[in-house]
């Protein structure tokens, strides 16, 4: 029996270029390029050990200095890789910061990864699914990517649920970032 390939249809987020970056709009959210002025937003998220538990090698909260360095890397990466990098996500109506989502090459060059994280107060409101769906559509329909993966720590079940809601296929475990990760994937329709 032939396995069906999960696909991601174009949900129609509005994509536009902003001065110094890009932006994607969804029903509730504005995703735009990070700027150095976003340090406090990123610190509120990355400074929380609950958020960082499954992020990076150490899984620990970041200091203000580490966040300032991270913003520099995010901005630099976005300039070198148009259409990719972590995007700042906020509510369209209020401007409240609700997280970050973006596309990045996996370090071994084997795939493009969808990555996202949210401040703890924003968990459970559908923001992760909404922003990730828009970024997936951007990757497939604007950047022309054929395949995008989502990687999670094996014990990060909430993130795995988000990836499954997006229609990504669970491909089991593989080594990435020097550790065992759960791999999910989707292909362009």
Language-model features, listed with the residues they occupy:
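Glycine-rich acyl-CoA binding loop
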Residues: 124-129
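Short alpha-helical segment within the catalytic ATP-binding CA
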Residues: 117, 130, 158
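GNAT-family acyltransferases
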Residues: 1-121, 134-138, 142, 151, ...
